[in-house]
Amino acid sequence: MYEYLTGLVTVVAPQYIVVDVNGVGYKLLVANPYRYQEDRTKKVQVYVYQAVREDNISLFGFTDQNEKNLFMQLINVSGIGPKSALAILANPDHQGLVDAITNNNVSYLTKFPGIGKKTASQIVLDLRDKLTNESSSSLFATTQLTVDATVNRELKDALEALAALGYKERDIKKVQKALMKEEQMATDEYLRQALRLLN
């Protein structure tokens, strides 16, 4: 069982990254791959969960132990598999997720893909008492980003990646204005351009 991998990110794709560890490339399914786009010349440490099925072995990656712990809590809920849990964690507001669970906010949880009212209620039932004060603390705090509805999906994903990287909303808004003047690009191209503007 892997705990974490340390290496260089060599591939950033819409649903996964590849981390090169001593010449071996590990494909990791992650919640927001574009957060790893910022500097691919430095080694990163990615926490790992290995999911084993009869026909498939998958590795899921996390930025830190807290994100992994939240993932592990989610997959223990009936009806939530690893990919569903990862889709929930794709929202960078992990504090909001924890608050929704502890405050019995079922409607908040139903906004995630594939999560209906029944599953959302099950998440609250199973996890409300298990989430400790430590897991629901500011460790999950992140930039809250409101993106204009007119922004295309690729740019929206890039802006959310900037928020996940820790950039302030005012800086992201400045970059958004500049990028909206450009022709439409892929998410990774938007992100590269945004990082150039920010740096």
Swiss-Prot record:
Where does the protein end up? Cytoplasm
Name which cysteines form disulfide bonds.
none
Primary gene name? ruvA
Assembly and binders: Homotetramer. Forms an RuvA(8)-RuvB(12)-Holliday junction (HJ) complex. HJ DNA is sandwiched between 2 RuvA tetramers; dsDNA enters through RuvA and exits via RuvB. An RuvB hexamer assembles on each DNA strand where it exits the tetramer. Each RuvB hexamer is contacted by two RuvA subunits (via domain III) on 2 adjacent RuvB subunits; this complex drives branch migration. In the full resolvosome a probable DNA-RuvA(4)-RuvB(12)-RuvC(2) complex forms which resolves the HJ.
What SMART domains is this protein classified in? HhH1
- Please provide the record's keywords in A-Z order: Cytoplasm, DNA damage, DNA recombination, DNA repair, DNA-binding
- Recorded protein name is Holliday junction branch migration complex subunit RuvA
CDD domains in UniProt = UBA_RuvA_C (cd14332)
Gene3D superfamilies with a match to the protein in the record: 5' to 3' exonuclease, C-terminal subdomain, DNA helicase RuvA subunit, C-terminal domain, Nucleic acid-binding proteins
Task: Tell me its family.
Answer: Belongs to the RuvA family.
The record's listing under InterPro entries reads:
DNA_helicase_Holl-junc_RuvA_I (IPR013849), Hlx-hairpin-Hlx_DNA-bd_motif (IPR003583), NA-bd_OB-fold (IPR012340), RuvA (IPR000085), RuvA_2-like (IPR010994), RuvA_C (IPR011114), RuvA_C_sf (IPR036267)
Q: MF terms per GO, please?
A: ATP binding; four-way junction DNA binding; four-way junction helicase activity
Task: Please list the GO biological process terms of this entry.
Answer: DNA recombination; DNA repair
Q: Region (Domain II): which ranges?
A: 64-142
Q: Which NCBIfam families did the record assign?
A: ruvA
Q: What HAMAP family does the record point to?
A: DNA_HJ_migration_RuvA
Q: What is the role of this chain? A: The RuvA-RuvB-RuvC complex processes Holliday junction (HJ) DNA during genetic recombination and DNA repair, while the RuvA-RuvB complex plays an important role in the rescue of blocked DNA replication forks via replication fork reversal (RFR). RuvA specifically binds to HJ cruciform DNA, conferring on it an open structure. The RuvB hexamer acts as an ATP-dependent pump, pulling dsDNA into and through the RuvAB complex. HJ branch migration allows RuvC to scan DNA until it finds its consensus sequence, where it cleaves and resolves the cruciform DNA.
Q: Which domain of life is it from?
A: Bacteria
GO cellular component terms, alphabetically, are: cytoplasm; Holliday junction helicase complex; Holliday junction resolvase complex
